UniProtKB/Swiss-Prot annotation:
Interaction with the Nucleoprotein-RNA and template-binding as annotated region, ranges: 245-265
Region Hinge, residue ranges: 171-193
Originating organism: Vesicular stomatitis Indiana virus (strain San Juan) (VSIV)
Alphabetically ordered keywords of this record: Chaperone, Host cytoplasm, Phosphoprotein, Viral RNA replication, Viral transcription, Virion
Protein name (database record): Phosphoprotein
Residue segments, region Interaction with N(0): 1-60
Length: 265
C-alpha cells in the first residue's frame, strides 16, 4: 500500500502526465486488432482438432435430419404456416367435437318447518352465488318480512311477483255494521252507545310511567292514525277495546317497545 501511495503522489507532481496519457492512447489506436486464434499462434500454441464429443454431437445432428424430413410427412401442411420461417405444423386433431351436457348441481333447499320439544323452527336456504352485499340484502329482506307480522296478518296477505321483486298486499277487512234500534224515551248506557271504537278517536288514554322522573303518556287514536280507514288497514277492528286500539297504534308507529319499557301498558 505504501508503494501505491508513493506512485499516486508522484503522478500528481509529474508535469508531463497528460502528454504521456495522450501518447498511450495514440499507440493503442494504431494497434491492429487480432483474434484470439492469432494471439495463440504468436505465443506458439498449436491448433488442435475439435474434441471427440463435439464430433459426436455433429454426427448425431446429421443423422437426425433425415428423420425430421421423414416425420414431416405425417403433419398436415398449412399454406399460411409455410410463410413463417422456422414454423413446423403440428398434427391436427382427427376427431370431431362432441356436445357434452353440463349439469350444475345446486345445494339450495326449499324452506323446511321443523317441530321439536323446543318449538317450531323454519329453515331458509339462501340462493347460490350471492356476493357478501347481496346476501346481506337478502337477510334484511327476510327480517323485514318477519317484523312486519307485528302489524298485519301475513297469512291473509296476497302475494304478487313483479319485475322488481314481490308485492304483498293486505286483504281489506270490511268492518261489521251493527244495527241499533233506538228506544224512545230511554237513555242508553255508554257501552251500548259505543258500537265502534273509532268513535273514541279523540278521547285520550293515559299510561302511568314506571319511573317517577317521567311524565305520564297521554295519547289518542287521532294522534296515531290519520283516519278510520288507516286504522282498519293495519288490522284495526271496530270491536276492539279502546286500549287495544291504542296499543295497535303504538305498534304501527313503532313506538310500542319504547313505551313498554317506560310506561305500564
Amino acid at each position: 500500500m505504501d508503494n501505491l501511495t508513493k506512485v499516486r503522489e508522484y503522478l500528481k507532481s509529474y508535469s508531463r502526465l497528460d502528454q504521456a496519457v495522450g501518447e498511450i492512447d495514440e499507440i493503442e489506436a494504431q494497434r491492429a486488432e487480432k483474434s484470439n486464434y492469432e494471439l495463440f499462434q504468436e505465443d506458439g500454441v498449436e491448433e488442435h482438432t475439435k474434441p471427440s464429443y463435439f464430433q459426436a454431437a455433429d454426427d448425431s445432428d446429421t443423422e437426425s435430419e433425415p428423420e425430421i424430413e421423414d416425420n414431416q410427412g405425417l403433419y398436415a401442411q398449412d399454406p399460411e404456416a409455410e410463410q413463417v420461417e422456422g414454423f413446423i405444423q403440428g398434427p391436427l386433431d382427427d376427431y370431431a367435437d362432441e356436445e357434452v351436457d353440463v349439469v350444475f348441481t345446486s345445494d339450495w333447499k326449499p324452506p323446511e318447518l321443523e317441530s321439536d320439544e323446543h318449538g317450531k323452527t323454519l329453515r331458509l336456504t339462501s340462493p347460490e352465488g350471492l356476493s357478501g352485499e347481496q346476501k346481506s340484502q337478502w337477510l334484511s329482506t327476510i327480517k323485514a318480512v318477519v317484523q312486519s307480522a307485528k302489524y298485519w296478518n301475513l297469512a291473509e296477505c296476497t302475494f304478487e311477483a313483479s319485475g322488481e321483486g314481490v308485492i304483498m298486499k293486505e286483504r281489506q277487512i270490511t268492518p261489521d255494521v251493527y244495527k241499533v234500534t233506538p228506544v224512545m224515551n230511554t237513555h242508553p248506557s255508554q257501552s251500548e252507545a259505543v258500537s265502534d271504537v273509532w268513535s273514541l278517536s279523540k278521547t285520550s288514554m293515559t299510561f302511568q310511567p314506571k319511573k317517577a322522573s317521567l311524565q305520564p303518556l297521554t295519547i289518542s287514536l287521532d294522534e296515531l292514525f290519520s283516519s278510520r280507514g288507516e286504522f282498519i288497514s293495519v288490522g284495526g277492528d271496530g270491536r276492539m277495546s279502546h286500549k287495544e286500539a291504542i296499543l295497535l297504534g303504538l305498534r304501527y308507529k313503532k313506538l310500542y317497545n319504547q313505551a313498554r319499557v317506560k310506561y305500564s301498558l
